[in-house]
Amino acid sequence: MYDMGTRRRALALADQGRSLNSVSKETGISRAAIRSWRIRVEPLDGNRSRPCPRCRATPEDPDEPAAYAYLLGLYLGDGCISPLRRGVYSLRIACADAWPGLIDACVEAVQLLRPDNRVCRVRSAGCQYVTGSSKHWPCLFPQHGPGKKHEREIALEPWQQRIVDAHPWEFVRGLIHSDGCRVTNWTTRLVAGKTKRYEYPRYFFTNRSADILRLFTGTLDAVGVEWKQPNSRNISVAKKASVALLDTHVGPKY
C-alpha cells in the first residue's frame, strides 16, 4: 500500500498535464492505481473493498462503465469465476504471452472495476492469468454459473445491455482481444500479363457459444459493421469499410 505522500506526488505529476503512462514509468506506480487515486486518494480504513455498486440499496451501474464493457467482453471470451473461501471469488482472464499490451489493458480494467483489491498476473504455459479476488464478481458478472459457457444460456441483464449500448466498441474490443484476431489474406491477379499479389485484412471472431456469437454480431450491427458467419463457430468481417471501422476502434492485438 502506498502512503499519502507517494499518492499525492503521483497525482501532482499527473496534474501537470503529463500522461498516466509517463507518470507510471517515472514512479513505478501502475496507471490503474493513479487513476483510482483521482477518484479517492485516501486508503479505505479496515475493509479493503468499497461497496459493490450492484449490492447497494438501489443497485447502480459500475463506476467505470467503459472499462466494464471491455472486461465483460474479455470475461465472455476467456474468463472464468471460481469460488474460494469465505464467500470470496476469483476472476481469471487468460491472456496470451504474445500480446503484452493486452495483458496490461486487462489488468487496468480489473483494477478500475475493483480498485481496492489486488490484481495479480499468474504465469502459465504460453499465457498469463490476470486474477483478482472479490466477493462481488458474481454480482458484476451474473453470467457466472456451473459448467462451460457454450453449454448453458448466456444473456445480458438489462443493466449490462445498457452499458454495452453506451460503450459498444469497448465490448467489441474485449471480445476480439479474447477470442478474435486480425489477419491478412492475399490473392493474385493477372494484370497486363503480369501476376500481381493483393493483400487485404480481415477480422475473425471464434466462440463455441451461439449466445456469445449473437451478442458479438448484435453489437457489430449496432455500430454499422458488416459481417458473415461461415460456420457455427466463426464470424468474419472482410468488407473494406467494416475492417476500417474495426481498425479505428479495435486494431490488431499488441
Model-identified regions with their sequence ranges:
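Internal intein/HINT superfamily modules and their associated LAGLIDADG
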Residues: 1-254
